[in-house]
């Protein structure tokens, strides 16, 4: 299992300089996981593309659907106390600590 940041998921669907790397990671290990937060983060990222008219609503909707299908069954709720402990013990954001929490089990 690999806990992936939302940006890594986005790289698969938004062609750019990191797309090939994300595709290689997926080929190496298809068991990707993330906290439920990833969905909101991806929607926020896609909102920017939609508002700048870089992607249509139909494309944004399809990216969200495909991304959710990719991670189905591997989305995790996180324990708030564990996340707060990680925040206390690091300089990471609360968002990043959610991903770390999933990776730590």
Predicted segments, located by residue:
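Short, well-structured N-terminal submotif of metal-dependent ribonuclease cores
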Residues: 1-37, 49-58
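Active-site neighborhoods of divalent-metal-dependent phosphate/nucleic-acid chemistry enzymes
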Residues: 72-105
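Hydrophobic side chains within alpha-helical segments
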Residues: 8-10, 44-47, 99-101
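Short glycine-enriched loop/turn motifs at secondary-structure junctions
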Residues: 25-27, 68, 104
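Conserved acidic
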Residues: 34, 59, 91, 95
């Amino acid at each position: 299992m690999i806990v992936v940041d939302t940006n890594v998921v986005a790289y698969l669907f938004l062609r750019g300089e990191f797309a090939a790397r994300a595709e290689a990671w997926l080929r190496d290990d298809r068991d990707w996981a993330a906290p439920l937060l990833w969905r909101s983060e991806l929607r926020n990222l896609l909102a920017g593309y939609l508002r700048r008219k870089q992607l249509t609503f139909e494309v944004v909707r399809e990216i969200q659907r495909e991304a959710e299908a990719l991670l189905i069954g591997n989305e995790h709720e996180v324990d708030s106390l564990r996340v707060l402990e990680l925040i206390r013990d690091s300089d990471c954001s609360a968002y990043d600590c959610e991903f770390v929490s999933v990776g730590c089990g």
